[in-house]
């Protein structure tokens, strides 16, 4: 498969984003893979307000000559961000830049490839230790409801 992305047609991956260091790395790796596969313009942005905003990613694509931008939601579930928030963000951008064709692609959702990936993860889990033997990482400690540290 060779996705058609070039100097006139760009892709923006839009994800939720996270405050946890390194949590967004996988989306960046996916974007890098798409860039390598297509040789075209591929940007990322996040809904969380951390990292690059959609507006910034959109303007980067336009600044590089894109006339069409495909926005691919990096989400598994068809929740509020996909039903309401992202379409509104795109409508705002389309009003601001009517000369740019703006397309909202499908979210990750269901795909047989995802079933195969989960089956692979089940296989990889064989031989891993029980969770009771894992020392909590600093972020895991925040999830405990103790008198010293309440859940956020």
What is each model feature region?
Residues 1-152:
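Active-site-proximal alpha-helix that buttresses catalytic centers in soluble enzyme cores
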């Amino acid at each position: 498969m060779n996705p058609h992305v070039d100097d006139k047609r760009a892709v923006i991956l839009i994800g939720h984003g996270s405050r946890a260091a390194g949590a967004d790395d996988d989306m960046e790796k996916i974007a890098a893979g798409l860039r390598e596969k297509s040789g075209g313009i591929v940007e990322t942005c996040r809904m969380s307000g951390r990292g690059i905003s959609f507006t910034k990613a959109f303007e980067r694509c336009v600044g590089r000559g894109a006339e069409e931008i495909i926005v691919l939601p990096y989400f598994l579930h068809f929740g509020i961000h996909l039903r309401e928030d992202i379409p509104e963000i795109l409508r705002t951008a389309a009003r601001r830049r009517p000369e740019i064709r703006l397309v909202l692609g499908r979210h990750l959702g269901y795909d047989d490839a995802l079933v195969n990936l989960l089956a692979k993860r089940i296989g990889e889990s064989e031989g891993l230790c029980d969770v009771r033997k894992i020392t909590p990482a600093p972020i895991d400690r925040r999830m405990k409801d103790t008198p010293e540290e309440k859940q956020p």
